[in-house]
């Protein structure tokens, strides 16, 4: 299994897909519970993809340390340390949900390392009024719901909006089967639901800003080109939140898909948008297709 040592105490577990120097890095709580993903699809489109597991989770080094409101800063710093260790200078960051939270922190902390950011169901949710006591104390992130519930692997059914597309239905069946297989594996509890892991409460990304006004101010400073991807039925990263974010970002394209929620499992479609976005950024420095002012001759 591939590991990268990023400091004296921490190894990050990662999965690698594709080859070449068009690097995509994604850091999530875990990647193993699903058989498909947007980033894996990108590896079919000529990208060299690294899927990192956040410190404290899964096969990465578990920790007893509580970073309080700084978990996402820690994850972002780990991404940079990983890139340095792998000899990667600039890269695309891609992430979904909490994984996209790492991207927002990278945009604010290390923008010079980013080519662009693929932000999948990325919010970010407003920090306004979110209690921080549980985060600061390191209380179990699942405690307010069900203290015996699995922490982070299975995606809730309400994330998936019903569809009549048989290919998507089959994809979801395969993913549930992969999740069940993972749960039945040897040492599952030790690896994925250790006491140290279950105590982690990261809170949402950018919670340290504390107010909606400060969040918007921070978003307005982001110069990194951002491709935002979302669904009309998402109850977490709602369309309203994503439109708010797009209005703040100076270099952003927002694509919202009808009939999808917090899981956009049309990965081929997302990759189509991402490839075009990336090529525009690389070729022109802008997120949109170059303007062509050549006169168009009509039929006379």
Residue ranges and their predicted role:
Residues 251-300:
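Catalytic active-site module of serine/aspartate enzymes centered on a nucleophile-bearing elbow/loop
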Residues 108, 117-155:
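Flexible "cap/lid" loop of the alpha/beta hydrolase fold
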Residues 51-94:
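Active-site loop/oxyanion-hole signature of alpha/beta-hydrolase fold enzymes
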Residues 129, 150-204, 208-209, 213, ...:
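Conserved alpha/beta-hydrolase catalytic His-Asp/Glu region
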Residues 222, 228-230:
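Short beta-strand/loop motif that positions the catalytic acidic residue
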Residues 235-241:
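Conserved alpha/beta-hydrolase "acid-adjacent" motif
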Residues 10-62:
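Conserved HGGG/HGGXW glycine-rich cap/lid loop of the alpha/beta-hydrolase fold
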Residues 95-99, 103:
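Gly/Ala-rich beta-loop-alpha elbow adjacent to hydrolase catalytic centers
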